UniProtKB/Swiss-Prot annotation:
Annotated keywords: Amino-acid biosynthesis, Cytoplasm, Isomerase, Lysine biosynthesis
HAMAP family hit by this protein: DAP_epimerase
UniProt-recorded Gene Ontology molecular function terms: diaminopimelate epimerase activity
Chain's role: Catalyzes the stereoinversion of LL-2,6-diaminopimelate (L,L-DAP) to meso-diaminopimelate (meso-DAP), a precursor of L-lysine and an essential component of the bacterial peptidoglycan.
Stated family: Belongs to the diaminopimelate epimerase family.
Pathway annotation: Amino-acid biosynthesis; L-lysine biosynthesis via DAP pathway; DL-2,6-diaminopimelate from LL-2,6-diaminopimelate: step 1/1
Subunit-structure text: Homodimer.
Protein name: Diaminopimelate epimerase
Domain of life the protein comes from: Bacteria
Compartment list: Cytoplasm
GO CC annotations on file: cytosol
Alphabetical list of NCBIfam families matching this protein: DapF
EC assignment: 5.1.1.7
Amino acid sequence: MNELANRSFSKMNGIGNEIVVLDLRDHPVAVSAADARAIASEVPYDQLMVLQPPRTPGTEAFVRIYNNDGSESSACGNGMRCVARQVFATSASDALTFETRAGLLNCWRPAPNLYTVDMGPPKLGWKDIPLAEEFRDTRSIELQIGPIDAPVLHTPSVVSMGNPHAIFWVDDVNAHDLARFGPLLENHPIFPERANITLAQIVDRDHIVIRTWERGVGLTKACGSAACATAVAAARLRRVNRVVHITLPGGELGIEWRASDDHVLMTGPAAFEFEGRFDPAVFAAAAS
């Protein structure tokens, strides 16, 4: 029998981003890509956040992040807020530190049911994002969808928040068929690790509206790292201030690109939905 059978989990969401939190700190179990896909077939999610025993002193857990297609990600802002909510529920600490593939993330609770995650500094160099070819200025790269003389989407900004993001600037985020263009752009050869694709509409210097096609997931109500990447990209273009609020289909996030250390801070809520246990039959079916 699969060791995950009958394990308890928490179903949560971060402004509509569907999250499953699986705490394996006390009973470590290896989670495979096939396991992640099997779990998604039972409990539909955007990201699976797996808490494993800490690898670094002073941290609460090493968090592995899976997309619902079984691929792994290094960052998920909404998922980390859900993880923070769950761990804060049994912790007397005012701040928590977690480790992911992208490094250490500090989390704190500025108000009831509001959680801030320090997502660290953005990566802006073309090799670090990464891109398949050199671009000296990642504020705007040569990439478009549609006819050469009348492209539908063009010249995105690119940023990594531990995962690659391409942000296309538009007048209306709802005027484009992101479900159609998203998978084409996600898998474009310029992105060797694929990319999250965001449409961004700047309302004023303090407000941006976005929609995101999430790598390994598809259309999503919210993507926290996309909100962070968009805020950074817009500030680099001098179109917004370093503190902005981002409107996503699922709700609102506050983003600050802190000038003192270049770190990006994301603040928003996390909602608990229910607890459950995995059905052993799900893993048996996946293994057959």
